[in-house]
């Protein structure tokens, strides 16, 4: 029986490259030279932005988003927290989200069921497995999910016949 998985994954190397590009861009910017820094923690996939003022944090966040887009990483996976003061400077944390949580998985399953397609969707941890009798039904399910807007970028992998 044909099936595929709906997942939300990040390419760790591309994320690292995007952060490195943002750091280089920050060094090139005359208005931000020496006034801010990015600190990427690979272990928990977070970026700590540090700057003297809040408007500089906003500019740095925009630099990071542009670097992500250039590396073809969807910016919906970037979750930013509110800036907070730390001594003489301001800090802001940005976390890269990965995996499908239960609420999003339920929305995906509901979307597939509301589409009245001849497929079944089952939640399996941080992914949703979609099975059907024909490959065409699965392709319709993929097309349906691509038309909908979710708060996380979705990828479709493990397509089996």
UniProtKB/Swiss-Prot annotation:
UniProt keyword list: Nucleotide-binding
Coiled coil feature spans: none
Pfam assignment, any one: DUF520
Keyword Membrane set for record: no
GO cellular component, one term: cytosol
Domain of life assignment: Bacteria
Molecular functions per Gene Ontology: nucleotide binding
Gene3D superfamilies registered for this protein in UniProt: 3.30.70.860, YajQ-like, domain 2 (3.30.70.990)
Protein family according to the UniProt entry: Belongs to the YajQ family.
Function statement: Nucleotide-binding protein.
Descriptive protein name: Nucleotide-binding protein PputGB1_4497
Organism: Pseudomonas putida (strain GB-1)
